[in-house]
């Protein structure tokens, strides 16, 4: 493609173009699950095995969509809509804020948002884990049928139930968010 790209750009990452004057993009999910093939990622983004670190400061949506492999995608910054939508395996870590519908239709895998999450995080979730380190906005886990959400400062929407975190839950939240176990005790487990 030629010209400028407006954000959010979707579940894509720039690779070196084979055509002068053009930019080339590939699906993030395809790159982490099937490798870069003959393509080279454009710095500062780095792929090491099945771990992708996205640090180019571009806001994306649907990061990790439909991931079905044991990949790890770390976005250093904010993301927009539907992070981890329809994931079955793998992990997406967002160090900043996440837009609406993070973890929507999650069917396995793990989505970790270290910042705030906008409304409808975990909507229609079937299985997997969603961890929100900041403040979740309204309708957390709306119509959730399975899986687990860890958050604080939120209330359960039926059919979900809010439970106190236990030893294993505290360790999981502490590990994923890089916080003390004492701080992790303030979280709730939504099942």
Regions found by a protein language model. Name each.
Residues 1-63, 70-72, 95, 114, ...:
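Intrinsically disordered, low-complexity terminal regions
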Residues 91, 110, 129:
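Beta-strand-rich binding-surface signature
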Residues 65-67, 84:
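Extracellular beta-strand-rich solenoid/capping regions of secreted or surface-exposed proteins
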